[in-house]
């Protein structure tokens, strides 16, 4: 297995982000605060929060903000206590989508291993409420692995999202270090089962570079995703949230990111590979509407 050391490396210039437009960030943040909604943009310290909030978009984080898993790369708070789901959350989320006039919305969640269905029913309710208030809005769900509960997966898919995203996060060799409660093969199976159960959905997955992976392992990962019917892939640079988290092993150059993009699209036939240092799984997710027109189902 590839070793992951604790030594940090210097951040390069290409990871610098332009200063955000404070006023427009404030408008989006205030709306989310008024409706008592969480976003992964805030909870996971996403580097693109300025750009996304300034454009009036956000990735909603439901059933949180605490997560029942403590992955060493993630900045979301760990909370293993049993918590009741908020029955008003789906309606509040739908209201935010309506007021922000979103053409495309991304809904994700923390892991809720304390729930029998992993939160599948809450995903279903959120999609249903958004459809009622914003019927023209396309919906992308970024879901956890549900501990391999395939009936829960089917419950989520019964809500008929346009896109089902589940991130594989890293190469197989690093899984036990990076996602100790996850499973590489289970993630691939979830993605494959998604297309088998709901053939018209667009499937998506993403992963990070800079954790100690080798280039040939990245190519294998891309091939594994394609073999399991994934349509869209996102690849971004891992940035350590703090000293207690896994540290960056390398900063991958923009040209290397582009190499993986070209390999995925030209050699493997993905619909789209979004690959750059600042790419995150929901970054520019609204562009899925263009893909849906280009590759109709």
UniProtKB/Swiss-Prot annotation:
Cited Pfam families: Radical_SAM (PF04055)
PROSITE patterns, per the entry: RADICAL_SAM (PS51918)
GO cellular component terms, A-Z: cytoplasm
Cofactor: [4Fe-4S] cluster
Bound cofactor: record note: Binds 2 [4Fe-4S] clusters per subunit. One cluster is coordinated with 3 cysteines and an exchangeable S-adenosyl-L-methionine.
GO MF term list: 4 iron, 4 sulfur cluster binding; lipoate synthase activity; metal ion binding
Reactions listed under catalytic activity: [[Fe-S] cluster scaffold protein carrying a second [4Fe-4S](2+) cluster] + N(6)-octanoyl-L-lysyl-[protein] + 2 oxidized [2Fe-2S]-[ferredoxin] + 2 S-adenosyl-L-methionine + 4 H(+) = [[Fe-S] cluster scaffold protein] + N(6)-[(R)-dihydrolipoyl]-L-lysyl-[protein] + 4 Fe(3+) + 2 hydrogen sulfide + 2 5'-deoxyadenosine + 2 L-methionine + 2 reduced [2Fe-2S]-[ferredoxin]
Metabolic or biological pathway: Protein modification; protein lipoylation via endogenous pathway; protein N(6)-(lipoyl)lysine from octanoyl-[acyl-carrier-protein]: step 2/2
Binding site for [4Fe-4S] cluster 2: 67, 71, 74
Binding residue positions for [4Fe-4S] cluster 1: 41, 46, 52, 282
Keyword terms, alphabetized: 4Fe-4S, Cytoplasm, Iron, Iron-sulfur, Metal-binding, S-adenosyl-L-methionine, Transferase
UniProt keyword Acetylation present: no
SMART domains according to UniProt: Elp3 (SM00729)
Transmembrane segments: none
Keyword Iron part of the UniProt annotation: yes
Subcellular location: Cytoplasm
Radical SAM core domain mapped to chain residues: 53-271
InterPro entries: Aldolase_TIM (IPR013785), Elp3/MiaA/NifB-like_rSAM (IPR006638), Lipoyl_synth (IPR003698), rSAM (IPR007197)
EC numbers: 2.8.1.8
UniProt record similarity statement: Belongs to the radical SAM superfamily. Lipoyl synthase family.
Name by which UniProt lists this protein: Lipoyl synthase 1
